[in-house]
Amino acid sequence: MTKEHWSEVKAREVTEHCRKHADELPDEIVVASGASTSGRLHVGNARDVLTADAVARVLRERYHEDVRVVWISDDVDPLRRIPRDLDGRLSEDYLGVPYKAIPVGDEPYSDRWARNFVEELREFGAEVEWISSAELYTDNGFVKLVREVVNDYYGGGGRLASVLERFGLEDARVYMPVCEECGRIATTRVVDVDGWRIEYVCEGRHEIGDAVLEGCGHRGELDLRKPIEVNGFEIPPGKLGWKIEWPTRWVYLGVACEPFGKDHYVAGGSYEVGSAIAEEFFGFPAPVPVPYEWITLDGKAMSSSKGHYVTLSDWGEVCHREVLRYLVLRGKPLKHLDLDLRFGLLQAVDDYDELEKRYFAGEADERERRIYELSRVDEIPEECPPHVPFRFCAVVAQVVGIEDDVSEEEFERALEIFRRTGHLEAEPEGFGREWLRERLEKASRWVDRYAPEEARFRVREEPEPVELSDKEREFLEDLVRRLESETTKEDPETLQRTVFEAARTAGLRPADAFRVFYNVVVGKDRGPRAGTLIAAVGVDRISRLIRGCLEASED
């Protein structure tokens, strides 16, 4: 029996959750996601949204057509460190200031990152409603909930305090005012609360990121309903602390499900505290959780502040968008995912291609079918694309000389190689033709930006002499005879075996044989898989280079 895909399990849980707390399903089911706009938003941030999108897709298909997916940008949080992208262009004076009040050009720092990210998400098939947390704090309904929270806590009501004390959070910053004098939110504390009025002071020393900030000493009053101006931008007068703000959002938006990083799911973490506040203080059921593991890049955590990340746009330039969705959604959200944009990307495309072929051949089981359908950015095509391996396209792109966009002449030369090597079962038309062109362009960019040195090459125009031992010469002579044999097929696997057989006949170690071969053909000790290279370049040209080298090396 095939196991269900995790998205189907979660969609059913969400439906049962909604029915448990009401007689019938709500008019709309809300699935939330979000991120702090502390810097350039990347693929790691996208796992949150793609997970939400997967649950929403299954909900719409099976249970409820009206599903709302919201993405909240945490833009009232304080700047903790200067991102490497803006190092030298953003003053450290902005440390501790809300993202929404930091100017980058003519717009707030946070809007720049959030807008780009939402546009990228749409390109990857995730339609979300972008909600700025700053805008939430100007909404009358949300502000009323904020008033209820701060008046209970600072006014001695005791309901919220009793929950926080249970988790050892007696000294939590429940509300964080923005100082009207210095613009910082990281250096203030509440002195008194009376209805809508907040009295605060900006004082003390506060560690934030790698810096220590000192309050400016200003004492002032704020109205929870009225925005203030900081650096030319209207922003909320303050915000709730994260562990209190999160459940307040759930209540206001009616959230039924939310994915989030696994760090929030530990005992005493944000989700457990938030659930207690939602249920005990507001009387609202905590949403169905979908904790997920972080996506790493080359084994390290992605970080916009440290410049170690890859964006959705970066990925889309060098690989199909569906492949990233496939990588994120095929396994359970808590499964570790490390991105390797070198050879790991090639394997990822191979795996996706294999799934796609199984899907169209009717060989995929129900779980595999769900994975493929969730991986799609657009509608499922009517026919299976012509699956010329991405790694072969990367070799062909270099043989043909493609750089970024593919000209019609380059495309026809590439098609001729695909035909000669048996990679095309039928002549591509329409969708298939454009799909192949796109794959060639992406493969070319991958070579330029991420391919390891051994995957990059330039085939010699003319033969050149190479210093050869007797065994190496014997190997090359036997190899060229085999290649010129009428029985030789120009498919990569057959050609790879041919190289191994010639090496074995000459009594040469495979590593030494390949080193000699690459020196003859591309002038380096290493290169792409030999069989693939021979197939792409063509047996005739390879044979000419080998024979020419043998002759030149005799002199």
Curated annotation (Swiss-Prot):
Enzyme class: ligase
GO MF, one annotated term: ATP binding
Ranges spanned by the short sequence motif 'HIGH' region, renumbered to the chain: 37-45
Motif ('KMSKS' region): 301-305
SUPFAM superfamilies for the chain: An anticodon-binding domain of class I aminoacyl-tRNA synthetases, Nucleotidylyl transferase
GO biological process, one term: lysyl-tRNA aminoacylation
Keywords: Aminoacyl-tRNA synthetase, ATP-binding, Cytoplasm, Ligase, Nucleotide-binding, Protein biosynthesis
Reactions mediated catalytically: tRNA(Lys) + L-lysine + ATP = L-lysyl-tRNA(Lys) + AMP + diphosphate
Keyword Aminoacyl-tRNA synthetase tagged: yes
Database matches in InterPro entries: aa-tRNA-synth_I_codon-bd_sub2, aa_tRNA-synth_I_cd-bd_sf, Lys-tRNA-ligase, Lys-tRNA-ligase_SC_fold, Rossmann-like_a/b/a_fold
Entry EC number(s): 6.1.1.6
Cell compartments where the protein resides: Cytoplasm
Gene Ontology cellular component terms for the protein in this record: cytoplasm
Pfam families in alphabetical order: tRNA-synt_1f (PF01921)
PANTHER family assigned to the protein according to its UniProt record, in alphabetical order: LYSINE--TRNA LIGASE (PTHR37940:SF1)
Family, similarity comment: Belongs to the class-I aminoacyl-tRNA synthetase family.
Entries under NCBIfam families matching the protein: lysS_arch
Protein name: Lysine--tRNA ligase
Organism classification: Archaea, Methanobacteriati, Methanobacteriota, Methanomada group, Methanopyri
Gene that specifies this protein: lysS
